[in-house]
């Protein structure tokens, strides 16, 4: 099935977005953790990730499975990300916009950096690569196939409008305008977490400079980010 999909779509690689979560959202689940079963099909994100990463390996694709994991942007998703890394030990995978998956729940605001723990786990597993998804301050728009998380993020839309839709009853899409503010505690910490990850991952060939355009910032902000 994976090989047929690649051929039919004339694609170069496989990416999975919130594995199982987009479908679960259609059955009124508003979250789906790594070992939480989809209410309709009884499949967990862990099973999906292991099956897809094995298929990519067996097909000999040059690019590893591209993973947008569970619980993007959720305080405490650090634990989910670490569990995901451990589950995929020995398999070639690429973790996307890892900054958005590196949040703890410490402190008065119940929001903290998990960058050190993520970097430690990545440094210990040479088969994993990642891109940062750096946040830059200013106006942008978030665009994602992760309807579940875009629905949750719509409460913070700036300006107050958003769109979510079902793509051919088979996938998801959400677009939410957003403004990152340097005087906002959460936004400022997101900015710092991204920079921490750049500095803490030992192998520069396994960590890539991105803003997850346009979700963390438009790519036109790259010169400023590089200067940082």
Which residue stretches match the model-derived regions?
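A general structural motif
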Residues: 44-45, 75-77, 184-194
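Aromatic-anchored helix/helix-loop segment that forms the rim or "lid"
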Residues: 168-192
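Generic alpha-helical structural element
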Residues: 41, 179, 183, 211-218
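Metal-coordinating catalytic core of metallo-dependent amide/deamination hydrolases
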Residues: 1-166, 176, 212
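Generic recognition of flexible, low-complexity loop/linker segments
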Residues: 52-55, 117-119, 183, 194-198, ...
């Amino acid at each position: 099935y994976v090989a047929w999909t690649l051929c039919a779509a004339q694609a170069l690689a496989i990416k999975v977005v919130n594995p199982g979560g987009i479908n679960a959202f259609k059955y009124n689940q508003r979250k789906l953790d790594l070992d939480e079963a989809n209410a309709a099909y009884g499949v967990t994100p862990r099973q999906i990730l292991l099956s897809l990463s094995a298929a990519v390996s067996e097909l000999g694709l040059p690019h590893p499975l591209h993973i947008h994991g569970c619980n993007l942007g959720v305080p405490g998703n650090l634990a989910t990300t670490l569990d995901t890394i451990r589950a995929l030990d020995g398999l070639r995978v690429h973790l996307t916009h890892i900054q958005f998956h590196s949040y703890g729940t410490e402190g008065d605001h119940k929001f903290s950096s998990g960058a050190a723990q993520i970097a430690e786990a990545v440094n210990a597993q040479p088969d994993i690569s990642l891109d940062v998804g750096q946040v830059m301050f200013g106006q942008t728009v978030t665009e994602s196939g992760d309807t579940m998380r875009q629905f949750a993020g719509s409460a913070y839309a700036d300006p107050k409008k958003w769109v979510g839709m079902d793509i051919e009853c088979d996938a998801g899409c959400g677009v939410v305008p957003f403004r990152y503010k340097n005087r906002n505690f959460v936004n400022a910490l997101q900015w710092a977490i991204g920079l921490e990850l750049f500095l803490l991952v030992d192998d520069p060939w396994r960590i890539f400079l991105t803003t997850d355009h346009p979700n963390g910032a438009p790519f036109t902000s790259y010169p400023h980010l590089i200067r940082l």
